[in-house]
Structure formats: structure tokens, C-alpha cells
């Protein structure tokens, strides 16, 4: 449990921003990381919820998270404590809410919610990839840099963001495109993210556009780098086609259309793939995606000529108005192929009567789209000649544009022949003119300029004379011409400028200066000709002005609409036209935007008004037109120019424009729609800081105007004075509604502390004392609420401005704090106000020292605030403020220390959030540190008890940091032991689970401090135990009735009855502390690095050991004494090796056996677990000393166990153990009468054998002989299993270590093992023994011992024989051929003896198993021999089995024959064709045995079996030799006569295998002739067996044996008439087999008839 806690705490420590001695920082989007670290989570939560609900109005799906991520219970969530499943669930919800928040990223409400998700759920860590990708479309937004600053990406593709994260800075689009094109994994990751977003129905336009744009740029980058087009198609096509077909997200689908268009333009698409794509797009058309879809289809069809739409596609396109949309879209996109294919398909698909309507529609369409000559010809070809050709007037333009170039080259297209003559062409123009003139003739005074402008566009396309006819409809054409210039196309503007010039020239006595601002508008046109015509018009105007300096009429002056216009004098007009414009005609002609910088530059002047009359006049003139012109475009242009006009002329400009601003402020929402946002912003930007009051007066008007004014005030704030800033801030915060741009402008405006002080002072929070007044106040409570609201907004504003930079506001804020606390019950939002105030004061007081303490700053106010509220956030912030005050002015908080700590122990310590812990830490560090600095005495043990008492309530993962902080503050060298002692006191009454928790925590706590502190705590705890024992003894000896005593380490008196239990708990903690991980290592490190430090630590350790030993001498309680010894052992383990040996050497000679045993255990553990323990060899004599007649059995065993461990560890120094082996193998060890001591001695000798090796030889004989005698006795003892096991183990090690010297003990060891019933049971020590003997003992010596043990097997039985044969098998496996070659004769002789078991009647009950095992092992032996070596042995075996006993023991020879043929069968089956020829040696004997009627039936059966194996494994035609076949065949077939006594299957198989291996017609005939005789045998069994053999022969040999059929037919016919049912059934089966082999064309019946 402790290790788990440590791991958890380490994890929290690594992730916690509140690290000791480190500036706290917290990831944040809205605040500086330092400020965010001290912010209250509750406050962030409240802010997030408010923003969340505002967002939910626009995105209702967010309400799902109202009870999860934004629920009240989320404040208590700590992801570190959640399990994997719970964290994965939160991750999934975080991803979902991120996708919903992404479209609102630029809104502050979304940032508030994100701030909460970052601070509470760490989305920047847990779902970092989704966090970054969700807001990647806003990569150039300033807040995206904060997104990166918070993020900790985990995926490799996002590691390219590392530099941007470190800075942090925003990303350029080029950076992202570069990363996408460079890293294909990032490309796939981002594409999948976009797809997932679409599938979750969270796609939004910014993401779709960003994805499409970046993908197109990546496509261009890859294409330009000569990537294989097919590879690029593979990367893009699947994702793009998915987007195109995804109808659930229009934005995603439109982005797919854009990408597909790019792919079609960049990569070669197969013509076969375009029709399916077009079909897929048209199937998914909607009113939302129709235009992008048509553009995409158009791009696809540019690469697929002669495409035809089917009927369904045409119907769908028509339903969306594709005809008119194609015309509209063709103005910006090339859609000629689409247009032609669409119209051709449309005309072909319609009936005759519909085609006329379509052609008429085409008439109005084709004139507005450009097609090539070939396309025009193809389009005309689908129209029948007999159609109404006059309806195709629109083709005139096409024919002119397409055919004319070919005429110049002398190439006339066939399309010309479709035109009848020029006369018809001219009729088309007349027709068009007539239609348009008719429309123009219908114009009246009610016709709008916009409609007339449309006619003007048509007239410009047909003929300029028609345009003149249109102008004639106006009595005064000047207004319409000006309207055309301001709103028409380039062609209309040019015609209008021409006509305007004519009008001026015709009316030379009229001053047309009213046209100058409109002409100025045309000078910024992108069209060069327009700008040239405009300059010519100005030149003409100037020339006429020069001719006639005095005009009788100024055009427009009498018009009431122009009453507010300013007019230019002749001189001013000349200045405007010549100096201002014509002087820079070349620049203006080249660049239309030149006006915006040049005119303001020329109008700028610092002259006095009387010397700048022309500049002022022109400025007034332009300003009046900017305010009063009826042409919106002209107004906007003039305002944008005037925005840049500065100097002395600004007063004139603002004087004229101010009424326009007032007019706009009075517009209602409907009327305001007639004014563009661009015009409003341009108008407001014309005002500077001198008009601040005027601008401020319009702040509460229309939202567009108000927003523009706010933005302008931010821009001019550097020129504002403090009163103006105060006035502006007051105006903003006093508004009932607070739109989002108010927040932005207040964030951007700089507010000095004097302004804040006046703002705070302007709010009066005073409760009326007069009841009548108070009653009226309640009736009119909104006044009081308004003050609270303004105060809240002021404080929120101050919070965003970094309150630490306003230290002078601390005093007024404390006064406000006092007022809020006093009126807490009367203010609804008092908690929120208190949090704001406390947080601001904490930042201010913590930022700078307090030189003079204001009377308003009182600690009792804060203490009362802390104790009077249940709100944890207020309590935490108040404590932080107390901490800051303690640091800045410690004397101010001195008298409030104990109430604060009492409060903390009962409430704050139980909270489980980072902010509360931060509060506690700050309070402890600052308050206690301040008291220490003041030198005040206070009861630190009482302070410690506050925290110890609160231990169960403190969250587990928060405890370590808190207690470390307390101890570091008050002094860990003194009070670490006090904490441990007080925890020990708490364990007395705690539950077992709580005791374990305290144990684990104490261990973790102690490990976190230095080695010196740990040793000091052990020393002080030991001294406490000894002191308490002495106090207890003194109270008992005095005889006084004392039940309680006072100890300095505890804040309360201790009951004498529990004092002993308390010491036991303290001793447990001492042991626990001493066993802490790496304690000894840390000590050794200090010893290496600092000798002086180690001397002090060593002294402390000696002191602790001395105290514990003294305690063990004085204590009389056995349980307490046991804990003393445990603690003593733990402390001793901390000693370095040299000191360890000194101390333990004394303890090993102590008179107390218990203490010696403890010392032996300590030594053993140190040797096993320690490092660099060579110095411990000095203790070998001391350990050996404990193996003596004076020691009890337990001590002797422990000493030998310890000696064994030391022998293993110090095996490199065997000379040290020569003396101990003599003691161990002597009367106190091996020869001890106690069985347990013997076992320990044997185990110790086993280990010493490995260490000493040959050095043990002087003692070997004595040890082994005595051990074998012990082994023999143990075998007979029912409880001697452990001793038996130990002896065998020791012998195994002897055989391993000294194989040459221990060979003489192999035979008795084998005999003992074979005789043991337990050796081969569960532990299998016997098998291990035999494996060791087989592996290590030389073959020659081993075989000798085995042969000598064989007679013992005859006595012990078959089980022993089988185990010995297994040992031989192991020996044969581990022996080389050469080793076997030296003893093979003796081995063969042994096997002959073992093979004779059947004759000698050994193992009668299990002789078959023994014989089989012997044969198998013998075959292993044979495999080790060469053929040359084995053949003589085989002949010897043959003569031994079949000849040696022929005369001396006729009955015994049968047993050997039985063995021999059993062996021969296994031998042939094992070695197969390699040894088939060995049968030549036994063929005659085999024939003789088979021929003899006296042969044993079992032998006869085994002989037949051997023949089967011999026949089956013949691959060299051994049995084809006539001499062998002639011998064996008759004898083998004669065995049929022994049918009842034989295994029929073996005989049948032998005869069939012989026929198969000796296949020839002569052999078949010979065998068949002999077999046929038995078909007529009087013995039914013989006849049946012969029939079975014939059946098997026909079945096995088939057609080969059919050759004997004619010879067999008479016999078969007789058999078919046999009276015996069995014979008849067998014959029927034979006939069936013969018929099967004869086939369909023949039958046995043919031979029988």
C-alpha cells in the first residue's frame, strides 16, 4: 500500500503546479499563468457556467453537458483519482464538447468554458490532440497561441508544434501546409479528424473552408514536387469522394466539391470515372449546395467531352434552375463544356413542341456565356433545320466572336453556312433593339434608377445609341449618370463619363461641381480606361472653368436635398481639380488606390485657418458630400479618405460630419439597415479625441454605431486624460446590458489607479439607519442593486487588469470589504463580491510590501469573515489574504493565529482541491514563518496535534505535501519525532485499516526528509521510549496513585495503563522508519561524500542502539521486548559494514540465546541483501562459535543456516570455511542426535562443498559414510523424508563438484535411491540424482557401479529394474561413441543377463515391461555402435538365444527364443531397411522353428511378427531372391494348418506382405498353388483362413493377383457350394472382391459358367 501511495503522490507531484520553491503557474486561456495558479476553481466554474448558458442558446446540444462536465459535482472531480474507465468516459465527453465549442472559439463565452475544462479536466493533457486540432482553423487568432501554450501533444505528427508551444506564438497557414505536405501521418490524422467531426454532425464553415484550402495547397505542393499522380489520387480521392457524398453536412460536402474541382484541374482523371462522379453529385443536389456542385461538375466536364445527362439527372438539374445558375456562375468560372453538354442533352430529351420553348430559352442564355466554335457547331447540330431559326438571335455574338478570326485566316467554318445572309443577321440586331427600346419607352417617373441601370447594361451590350435613347427619358440626366458611375459596370461607367462630358460641354454656363465627388469615386476603379475617362472629364471641367470663371448657375444648389452641401469657389475648384488631382494624373492613372494616401497628404496643413482656406474648403466640400450624398458607395469612399485627413482641417471635417453621426444615432433598426457597417465605421473613424464627448453621447445608440465608437475610443485612448477615461468607464459599466464588445473594449482600455479609486469611491454601500428611509430603500431597492452591480463590474474590471499593479487600491478595497461583510445579509451576490474583493486584495498585498498599515486593514475582520461563512472559496481566499498580510505585516496577524489554525484543522484540511491545498500551504508558510521571525514562543506540539488530529480527514494524496510543509516550517530536525509519537498515540485507538494507513504514511513522510532528520527522529523516539519507561517505573516505585503523566512530545496527559502500548507503537514506527527503502544506500552515499556529516550520523546511530539495548535490559514485558529486538535489528541494519561487524560480534557472544538468535538473523539478512559486504567475513568465527555444545538446537540451526548463506556469498574466499566444515561435520552438527540439526548440517555441508571444492576431500569420506548411514536409517523412518531429501541433495552436489573423487560412492547411492520409496515420489529427487550421476560420472566408472547394482534390482523388484534401466538410458544418451566403445562388451554382457530375466524367472509379474524397456535401452546402445561392431554382437545374441541352451536347458531356450524374436521385431521396426539383411542370419532357424510342430505358439506368433516387419521394411529386394523366397514361402503358408492356435491377422499380413514384396507371376503361382490346397482342407478354420488370405491378396495386389484366377476358379466354385455358413459368407466376400478387381466388363460368373 505504501508503494502505491508513493506512486500516486509522485504522479500528483509531477502534475501539480503548486510545487515547493517554485513559482506557481497554471495553464490558462484567459489569465496569466501566475495569476491563474492562485485563482479559485469555484470562481472559474461560476464564470464558465454563465458563458456556457449563453452559448447553449445558440447550440442547444451543449445542454447535454449541463449535468456532467458543467455540473455542480464536477467541482469535486479529480482525474488523478479516477480509474481508467472513468477517465476514458470523461475523455469522450471532452472530445464531444470540444467539437461543439470550436465554432464559437472567437467568442469569450467559449473561452470561459474552455478555461474550466482545462483547469478541472486537463483537456490540454488528456485529449491534447483533439484540443489542438479542434481550433486549428483559427491558427492565426491571438488566442490560438494560448491554446498552444497550454497544450501537451502526445502524437508524433503534432511534435512540429514544439517551437510554437515554447514561444508561444500563432501559426501561419504556410507552417501548417508545410507540415501536412511533409508528414503524411499528420495529413491522414487531420483528414480523419475532419471526417470524424462531420460524422458527429459538428462540422462548421470555418473548419470546412480551412480543410479544403489546406488540402488544395498540399495538393499543389505535392504535384509541383513531381509526385506520382496515381499516388496522389490514392491519398486524396477516397476522402474527397466521401466528403462529396456526405449529405448530412453541407459545409463538408461543399469543401469536397472544392477539392474535387482542384483534383480535376491538377491530376489526370480517367474518363471512365467522371460519369459516376457526376451522377453521385447530381443525386445529392440541394438548394444549399447547388452552386458549388455545379461548379464542381463544370470542372469535371472540362476533361470529358460529349457527355450526356440522363433523364433523371436533367430533371433534377432543372428543378434547381440550372439554366439560369449556369449563366450566373459562368461569369467567374469556365463552364462551357457543362453548358453545351447540358443543353444538348436537354434538347435531345424533349419532344418537338418542348424544343421550341427550349430554343427560345437558349436564345436568352447563350448570349451571356462564351463557347468555342466547335462547341457552337455541336450545339447547333442538334437543332433541326426546320426550326424557327429567327429565335436564335443570340448566336450572332457567338458567330461574330468565333468566325471572324477564321475569316482573317481564310478559313470559314461550316457553321457560317447555317446563316442565310447578312440581311438576316441585321434583322437580329433590329429585333433586339426593338425589344429594348420598347422597354425603355415604358420608363416613367416611378421607374427606379436600379431598373434603369439594368436597361443600361443591356443597351451597352447592344448599341451605345440605345443608351442615349435611355438617357433621353430623363429630363435631367445628370442624377442618373452619377448613379450609373457609382453603381454600374465598367462599360456603363465609361458611357456615363462620356455622356457626362458631353453634357458639361453643352452647358458651359452651368457649374457642375456636384459631379466632382462622384468622378473621384470612378478614379479608384480597377479599370484603367475608367480612370482615364474620369481624368479627361476633370480636365474638361477645368478647361471650361478657366474659360468661364463666373457661372450663372451652380447645378443642384437649389435642390432641397442638397441644402447641406458645401460649394467650392472658382479658385477652390481649380485647386481641387488641378493641384489636387490632375497634378498626379499619371500616378492616379496607374493605381486607383493612390487617392487614399495622396489626398489626405495634400489636405494636411498646420497653417492657421485663414491661411489654409483652400484645404479647409475642399475638406468641407468632401465632408458635406460624405454626409449628404445619395450614393452610398460615394459616401463610403469619401469617408475612408477623410479618415486619413488630419491637421487644422479636422475641425471643419468633424463640424460637418457630426450632424450625420447624430442622424445615424436616431435611426431605428429598420432604417439603419440602409446604412452599411463599413460606412458607419468609416464615419466614426473620422472623429478624434477632441470629439470624445460627442462620441460618448452616442454610446448607447444602435449596436453597430456603439461598437464602432468603442473601437474608436480604444484607438484614441493615448490622447485621453484621466477624467475622460473615468467618464468612459462609468458610461460603459452603467449600461444595463453589457454586450460582448463592452468587455473587449474595457480589456483594451488602460485605466490608472486614480481612475479606479474614483470609481470605487463613487459606489456607496451604506445601510440606512432611519427605518423610514430603510423602508423606502426596500421599496426602491433597485438603486441599491445598481450600486452593487456597478461595484461588481468595477471589481471584475480590476481583476482583468492585473490587480497586483494597483497596490494603492488596497485600503479603499478593505473599506469596501468591511462594508460588504456588514451588509452581507442584504446583498444577494455577497459571496461573489467577497471572493472578488479577497482575491484582489491578496494580489495587491502580495505584490508589494506595506510601508504603513491602514486602519481599515484589520485581521479580526478577516477572521470573522472566515468563521462566519460556509463557502470554501471565501474561506480559502481569506486565508490567502491572511498569509499575504502575515508576510507583509506579521504583527498585524499575531493575535489571530490560534483561531485560524483551529479553523483550518476543522474545515480546510479536509478539502480535496489544489486551491485549498495552496491556501493551507500559504497559511502555514507565511503565518508560522512570520511568528518565527518575530521570535514569539508558541506551543509547536499543540500545532502539530492540530494536523495529526485532522489526518483522517485530509485527502490521502494531499497529506505528504502538507505535513512536509508543516515540519519544514517549524523544524523537521526537532519535530519529525513528535509527529511520529503523536501518530503512534493515535494508533492506539484506531481501527486496523487506519493503523495500516498511518504506518504507510509515516514511512512515506520520513522518506521525504534527509538522512540526518531520519536518524534524529529514531534517536528521539528511542529516547522517548526509554524516558517513558523510566517515568512509569518511577511512578510505580513511588507508590503514589498516579494515573496520568505529562510528556513533552504530547499535548495531553497520558494514561499509565496505555503507556506500554504507546511504546510498542513507537517501536513499530522506529522499525518502519529504519526499514525505509534506500535508507542504507543514502547512508553509504553520505559516508563516501562527506565524512564529517557521517560522523554525526554515526554518533546518532550508536546512541539509538545504546538506547534500545538499555531499553531491552530494563523492559520486562515479553511483547515489548520482542518489539525492542525488532527495532534494534532494523537500526543495526543501517550501520556500515565495519561498524556492523563490531556491534554484531559482541551480540553473537551475548549470554542471552534470544539476542544471539536475533543477531544471527540480522547477519544472515545483511549478507543476503547487502552490497559490498566482504567485510562481514570477519563474523565467520563468531557465527561458527554458536555451533557448540552450549547452544540450543534452534541457535545451532540458525548458525548453520547463516554459515551456509555466508558460504554462498563469499565463495571466492573458500579458505575461510575450512575450519567451519570441521565443526559442522562434527558432533555438534552432522553427528548431532537431533534430526533437525542433522538436516541443517547436511544443507550447510552441501553449500560448503560448492565453496570448498577439493578442500573438502579430507573430510569427504567421513561425511559421506556417515551420511549414507543416516540415509539408510532415514529410509526406514516414516518421518525421515526431510533428512532423506537433504542427504540425496548433498550427494548430488558431491557428484557435481567432485565427480572423480566421489565415484566410489555411486554404487551405494544408487542402491539407496532404488531402495527408497520416497526418492521418486513428488519431489523427484531420485530422478535428479540419476540425471546428475549420468551427466557427471565418467561412463566407465558409472557402468561398473550400475552393473554392481543390478543384482539388488532382482531383490527389489521390477520397479527398481525399470529405474536402473532408465539410468542406463540417461548414461547412454550423455556418453560419446568413443566412451561407449571402451565398455561396450561389458554393457552387452549386462544386457544378456537382463535379457535372461524371463528364463531366470525374475520380475515374473512384470517381465514383459522389464524386457521391453531393456530392449528399448539396448537399441539406444546399438545406435551408439557401428555396423562392424554390432554384427558380431548380433551373431552372439543369435547364438545365445537359439543355440546355447539347446542341449543343456531345452525349456529355457523357449524363453530366450521368445525374447529374441520380440527383440528382432522391435529391432526391424526401429531401424527398418537398414537391418533387413540381418534376417539372413536367422532365416534357417526361423524356417526350422516354423516347420517344427513342437514350436511354442507364442514363439510361432513372434516369428510371424518378425517376418511381417522384415517384409514391410524390405526396400532392396531381399526377399525376391529365389533361394530365400523358396525357403520361406512354403513354410509360411504351411502355418495355415495351425489356424486355431495362431493370430490369424499376423499370418494373413505376413503372407500378403511376402506376396507384395516378392511380386512375380512365378512366385504368385507357387503361392497360389499351395494356398488352393487349403481351400479344400477338411479343417474349417484352415479353409476360412485360406479364403481370408485369398481375399486380402486380391484386395492388396489387384490385377497382379488376378492372373491366378483361372487356376482358382474350380476351387472357388466348390467353396460356393460349401455347407458351412462361415465358409459361404467368406467366399461371398472373396467373390465380391474379385468382381471389383475384374471391372465392369468381366465377372467371376463368366469363369464359372
UniProtKB/Swiss-Prot annotation:
Involved in nucleolar processing of pre-18S ribosomal RNA. Required for optimal pre-ribosomal RNA transcription by RNA polymerase I together with a subset of U3 proteins required for transcription (t-UTPs). Involved in ribosome biosynthesis. This is U3 small nucleolar RNA-associated protein 10. GO terms for cellular component: 90S preribosome; preribosome, small subunit precursor; small-subunit processome; t-UTP complex. Disulfide bonds: none annotated. Belongs to the HEATR1/UTP10 family. It comes from Schizosaccharomyces pombe (strain 972 / ATCC 24843). It is found in: Nucleus, Nucleolus. GO terms for molecular function: snoRNA binding. Component of the ribosomal small subunit (SSU) processome.
Amino acid at each position: 500500500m505504501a508503494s502505491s501511495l508513493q506512486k500516486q503522490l509522485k504522479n500528483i507531484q509531477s502534475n501539480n503546479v503548486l510545487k515547493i520553491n517554485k513559482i506557481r503557474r497554471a495553464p490558462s486561456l484567459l489569465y496569466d499563468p501566475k495569476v491563474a495558479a492562485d485563482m479559485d476553481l469555484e470562481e472559474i466554474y461560476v464564470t464558465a457556467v454563465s458563458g456556457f448558458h449563453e452559448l447553449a442558446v445558440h447550440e442547444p446540444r451543449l445542454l447535454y453537458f449541463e449535468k456532467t462536465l458543467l455540473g455542480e459535482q464536477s467541482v469535486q472531480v479529480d482525474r488523478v483519482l479516477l480509474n481508467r474507465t472513468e477517465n476514458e468516459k470523461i475523455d469522450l465527453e471532452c472530445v464531444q464538447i470540444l467539437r461543439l465549442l470550436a465554432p464559437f472559439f472567437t467568442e469569450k463565452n467559449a473561452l470561459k468554458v474552455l478555461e474550466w475544462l482545462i483547469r478541472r479536466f486537463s483537456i490540454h493533457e488528456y485529449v491534447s490532440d483533439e484540443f489542438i486540432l479542434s481550433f486549428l482553423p483559427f491558427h492565426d487568432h491571438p488566442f490560438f497561441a494560448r491554446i498552444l501554450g497550454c497544450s501537451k501533444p502526445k502524437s508524433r505528427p503534432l511534435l512540429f508544434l514544439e517551437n510554437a508551444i515554447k514561444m508561444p506564438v500563432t501559426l501561419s497557414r504556410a507552417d501548417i501546409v508545410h507540415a501536412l505536405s511533409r508528414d503524411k501521418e499528420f495529413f491522414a490524422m487531420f483528414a480523419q479528424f475532419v471526417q470524424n467531426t462531420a460524422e458527429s454532425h459538428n462540422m462548421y464553415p470555418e473548419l470546412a473552408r480551412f480543410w479544403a484550402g489546406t488540402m488544395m495547397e498540399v495538393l499543389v505542393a505535392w504535384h509541383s514536387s513531381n509526385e506520382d499522380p496515381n499516388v496522389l489520387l490514392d491519398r486524396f480521392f477516397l476522402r474527397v469522394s466521401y466528403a462529396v457524398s456526405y449529405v448530412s453536412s453541407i459545409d463538408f460536402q461543399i469543401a469536397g466539391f472544392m477539392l474535387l474541382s482542384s483534383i480535376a484541374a491538377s491530376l489526370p482523371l480517367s474518363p471512365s470515372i467522371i460519369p459516376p462522379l457526376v451522377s453521385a453529385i447530381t443525386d445529392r443536389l440541394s438548394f444549399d449546395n447547388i452552386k458549388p456542385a455545379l461548379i464542381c461538375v463544370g470542372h469535371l466536364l472540362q476533361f470529358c467531352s460529349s457527355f450526356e445527362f440522363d433523364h433523371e439527372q436533367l430533371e433534377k438539374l432543372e428543378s434547381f434552375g440550372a439554366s439560369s445558375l449556369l449563366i450566373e456562375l459562368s461569369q467567374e468560372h469556365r463552364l462551357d463544356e457543362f453548358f453545351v453538354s447540358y443543353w444538348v442533352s436537354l434538347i435531345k430529351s424533349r419532344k418537338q413542341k418542348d424544343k421550341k420553348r427550349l430554343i427560345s430559352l437558349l436564345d436568352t442564355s447563350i448570349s451571356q456565356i462564351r463557347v468555342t466554335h466547335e462547341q457552337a457547331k455541336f450545339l447547333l447540330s442538334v437543332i433541326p433545320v426546320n426550326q424557327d431559326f429567327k429565335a436564335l438571335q443570340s448566336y450572332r455574338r457567338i458567330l461574330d466572336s468565333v468566325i471572324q478570326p477564321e475569316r482573317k485566316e481564310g478559313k470559314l467554318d461550316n457553321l457560317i453556312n447555317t446563316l442565310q445572309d447578312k440581311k438576316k443577321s441585321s434583322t437580329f440586331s433590329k429585333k433586339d433593339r426593338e425589344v429594348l427600346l420598347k422597354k425603355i419607352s415604358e420608363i416613367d417617373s416611378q421607374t427606379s434608377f436600379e431598373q434603369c441601370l439594368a436597361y443600361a447594361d443591356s443597351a451597352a451590350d447592344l448599341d451605345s445609341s440605345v443608351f442615349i435613347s435611355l438617357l433621353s427619358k430623363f429630363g435631367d440626366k445628370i442624377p442618373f449618370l452619377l448613379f450609373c458611375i457609382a453603381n454600374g459596370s465598367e462599360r456603363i461607367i465609361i458611357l456615363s463619363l462620356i455622356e457626362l462630358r458631353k453634357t458639361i460641354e453643352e452647358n458651359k454656363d452651368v457649374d457642375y461641381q456636384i459631379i466632382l465627388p462622384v468622378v473621384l469615386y470612378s478614379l479608384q476603379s480597377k479599370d484603367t480606361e475608367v480612370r482615364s475617362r474620369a481624368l479627361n472629364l476633370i480636365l474638361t471641367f477645368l478647361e471650361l472653368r478657366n474659360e468661364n470663371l463666373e457661372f450663372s448657375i451652380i447645378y443642384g444648389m437649389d435642390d432641397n436635398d442638397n441644402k447641406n452641401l458645401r460649394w467650392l469657389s472658382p479658385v477652390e475648384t481649380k485647386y481641387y481639380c488641378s493641384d489636387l488631382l490632375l497634378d498626379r494624373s499619371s500616378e492616379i492613372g496607374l493605381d486607383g488606390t493612390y487617392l487614399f494616401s495622396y489626398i489626405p497628404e495634400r489636405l494636411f496643413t498646420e497653417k492657421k485657418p485663414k491661411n489654409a482656406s483652400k484645404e479647409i474648403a475642399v475638406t468641407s466640400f468632401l465632408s458635406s458630400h460624405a454626409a449628404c450624398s445619395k450614393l452610398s458607395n460615394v459616401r463610403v469612399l469619401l469617408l475612408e479618405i477623410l479618415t486619413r485627413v488630419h491637421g487644422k482641417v479636422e475641425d471643419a471635417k468633424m463640424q460637418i460630419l457630426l450632424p450625420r453621426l447624430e442622424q445615424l444615432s436616431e435611426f431605428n433598426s429598420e432604417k439603419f439597415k440602409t446604412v452599411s457597417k463599413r460606412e458607419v465605421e468609416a464615419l466614426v473613424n473620422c472623429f478624434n479625441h477632441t470629439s470624445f464627448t460627442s462620441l460618448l453621447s452616442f454610446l448607447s445608440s444602435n449596436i453597430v454605431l456603439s461598437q464602432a465608437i468603442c473601437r474608436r475610443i480604444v484607438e484614441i485612448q493615448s490622447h485621453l486624460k484621466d477624467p475622460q477615461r473615468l467618464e468612459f468607464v462609468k458610461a460603459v459599466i452603467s449600461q444595463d446590458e453589457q454586450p460582448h464588445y463592452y468587455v473587449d473594449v474595457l480589456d483594451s482600455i488602460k485605466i490608472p489607479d486614480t481612475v479606479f479609486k474614483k470609481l470605487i469611491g463613487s459606489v456607496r454601500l451604506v445601510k440606512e439607519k432611519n427605518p423610514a428611509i430603510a423602508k423606502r430603500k426596500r421599496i426602491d431597492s433597485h438603486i441599491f442593486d445598481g450600486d452593487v452591480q456597478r461595484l461588481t463590474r468595477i471589481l471584475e474590471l480590476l481583476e482583468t487588469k492585473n490587480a497586483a499593479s494597483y497596490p494603492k487600491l488596497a485600503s479603499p478595497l478593505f473599506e469596501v470589504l468591511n462594508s460588504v461583510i456588514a451588509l452581507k445579509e442584504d446583498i444577494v451576490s455577497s459571496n461573489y463580491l467577497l471572493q472578488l474583493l479577497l482575491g484582489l486584495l491578496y494580489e495587491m498585498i502580495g505584490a508589494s510590501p506595506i510601508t504603513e498599515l491602514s486602519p481599515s486593514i484589520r485581521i479580526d475582520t478577516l477572521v470573522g469573515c472566515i468563521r462566519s461563512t460556509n463557502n470554501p472559496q471565501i474561506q480559502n481566499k481569506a486565508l490567502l489574504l491572511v498569509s499575504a498580510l502575515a508576510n507583509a505585516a506579521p504583527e498585524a496577524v499575531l493575535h489571530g493565529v490560534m483561531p485560524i489554525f483551529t479553523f483550518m484543522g476543522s474545515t480546510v484540511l479536509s478539502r480535496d482541491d489544489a486551491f485549498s491545498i495552496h491556501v493551507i500551504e500559504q497559511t502555514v508558510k507565511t503565518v508560522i514563518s512570520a511568528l518565527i521571525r518575530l521570535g514569539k514562543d508558541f506551543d509547536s506540539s499543540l500545532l502539530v496535534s492540530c494536523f495529526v488530529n485532522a489526518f483522517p480527514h485530509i485527502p490521502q494524496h494531499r497529506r505528504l505535501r502538507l505535513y512536509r510543509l508543516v515540519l519544514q516550517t517549524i523544524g523537521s530536525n526537532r519535530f519529525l519525532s513528535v509527529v511520529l509519537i503523536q501518530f503512534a498515540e493515535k494508533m492506539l485507538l484506531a481501527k486496523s485499516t487506519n493503523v495500516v494507513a498511518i504506518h504507510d504514511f509515516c514511512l512515506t513522510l520520513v522518506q521525504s526528509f534527509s538522512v540526518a532528520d531520519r536518524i534524529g527522529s529514531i534517536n528521539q523516539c528511542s529516547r522517548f521510549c526509554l524516558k517513558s519507561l523510566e517515568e512509569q517505573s518511577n511512578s510505580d516505585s513511588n507508590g503514589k496513585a498516579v494515573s496520568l503523566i505529562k510528556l513533552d512530545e504530547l499535548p495531553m496527559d497520558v494514561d499509565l495503563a496505555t503507556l506500554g502500548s504507546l511504546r510498542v507503537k513507537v517501536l513499530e514506527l522506529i522499525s518502519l522508519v529504519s526499514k525505509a527503502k534506500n535508507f542504507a544506500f543514502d547512508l553509504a552515499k553520505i559516508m563516501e561524500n562527506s565524512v564529517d556529516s557521517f560522523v554525526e550520523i554515526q554518533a546518532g546511530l550508536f546512541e539509538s542502539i545504546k538506547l534500545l539495548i538499555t531499553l531491552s535490559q530494563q523492559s520486562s514485558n515479553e511483547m515489548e521486548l520482542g518489539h525492542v529486538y525488532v527495532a534494534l535489528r532494523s537500526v543495526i541494519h543501517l550501520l556500515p559494514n565495519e561498524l556492523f561487524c563490531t556491534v554484531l560480534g559482541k551480540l553473537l557472544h551475548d549470554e542471552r540465546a534470544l539476542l544471539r538468535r536475533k543477531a544471527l538473523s540480522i547477519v544472515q539478512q545483511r549478507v543476503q541483501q547487502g552490497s559490498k559486504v566482504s567485510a562481514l567475513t570477519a563474523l565467520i568465527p563468531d557465527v561458527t562459535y554458536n555451533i557448540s555444545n552450549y547452544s540450543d538446537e534452534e541457535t545451532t540451526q540458525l548458525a548453520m543456516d547463516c554459515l551456509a548463506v555466508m558460504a554462498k556469498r563469499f565463495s571466492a574466499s573458500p579458505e575461510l570455511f575450512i575450519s567451519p566444515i570441521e565443526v559442522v561435520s562434527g558432533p555438534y552438527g552432522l553427528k548431532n542426535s537431533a534430526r533437525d540439526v542433522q538436516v541443517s548440517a547436511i544443507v550447510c555441508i552441501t553449500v560448503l562443498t560448492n565453496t570448498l571444492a577439493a578442500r573438502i576431500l579430507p573430510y569427504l569420506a567421513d561425511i559421506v559414510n556417515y551420511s549414507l548411514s543416516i540415509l539408510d536409517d532415514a529410509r526406514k523412518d516414516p518421518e525421515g523424508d526431510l533428512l532423506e531429501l537433504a542427504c540425496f541433495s548433498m550427494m548430488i552436489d558431491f557428484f557435481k563438484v567432485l565427480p572423480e573423487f566421489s565415484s566410489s560412492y555411486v554404487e551405494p547411492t544408487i542402491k539407496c535411491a532404488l531402495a527408497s520409496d520416497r526418492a521418486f515420489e513428488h519431489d523427484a529427487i531420485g530422478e535428479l540424482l540419476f540425471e546428475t550421476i549420468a551427466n557427471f560420472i565418467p561412463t566407465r566408472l558409472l557402468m561398473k557401479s550400475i552393473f554392481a547394482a543390478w543384482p539388488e534390482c532382482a531383490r527389489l523388484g521390477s520397479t527398481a529394474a525399470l529405474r536402473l534401466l532408465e539410468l542406463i538410458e540417461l548414461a547412454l544418451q550423455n556418453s560419446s561413441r568413443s566412451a561407449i566403445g571402451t565398455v561396450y562388451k561389458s554393457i552387452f554382457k549386462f544386457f544378456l543377463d537382463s535379457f535372461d530375466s524371463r528364463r531366470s524367472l525374475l520380475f515374473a509379474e512384470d517381465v514383459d515391461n522389464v524386457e521391453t524397456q531393456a530392449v528399448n535401452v539396448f537399441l539406444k546402445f546399438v545406435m551408439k555402435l557401428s555396423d562392424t561392431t554390432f554384427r558380431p554382437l548380433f551373431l552372439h545374441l543369435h547364438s545365445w538365444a537359439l543355440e546355447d541352451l539347446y542341449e543343456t536347458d531345452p525349456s529355457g531356450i523357449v524363453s530366450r527364443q521368445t525374447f529374441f524374436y520380440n527383440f528382432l521385431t522391435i529391432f526391424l521396426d526401429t531401424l527398418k531397411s537398414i537391418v533387413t539383411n540381418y534376417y539372413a542370419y536367422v532365416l534357417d532357424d526361423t524356417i526350422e522353428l516354423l516347420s517344427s510342430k513342437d514350436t511354442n505358439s507364442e514363439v510361432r506368433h513372434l516369428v510371424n511378427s518378425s517376418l511381417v516387419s522384415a517384409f514391410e521394411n524390405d526396400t532392396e529386394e531381399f526377399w525376391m531372391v529365389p533361394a530365400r523366397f523358396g525357403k520361406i514361402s512354403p513354410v509360411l503358408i504351411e502355418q495355415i494348418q495351425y489356424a486355431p492356435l495362431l493370430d490369424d491377422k499376423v499370418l494373413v499380413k505376413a503372407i500378403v506382405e511376402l506376396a507384395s514384396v516378392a511380386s512375380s507371376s512365378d512366385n504368385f503361382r507357387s503361392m497360389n498353388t499351395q494356398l488352393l490346397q487349403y481351400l479344400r482342407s477338411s479343417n474349417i478354420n484352415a479353409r476360412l483362413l485360406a479364403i481370408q488370405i485369398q481375399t486380402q491378396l486380391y484386395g492388396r495386389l489387384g490385377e497382379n493377383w488376378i492372373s491366378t484366377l483361372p487356376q482358382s476358379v474350380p476351387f472357388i466354385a466348390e467353396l460356393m457350394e460349401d455347407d458351412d455358413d462361415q465358409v459361404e459368407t467368406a467366399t461371398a466376400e472373396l467373390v465380391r472382391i474379385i468382381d471389383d478387381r475384374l471391372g465392369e466388363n468381366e465377372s467371376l460368373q463368366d469363369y464359372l459358367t
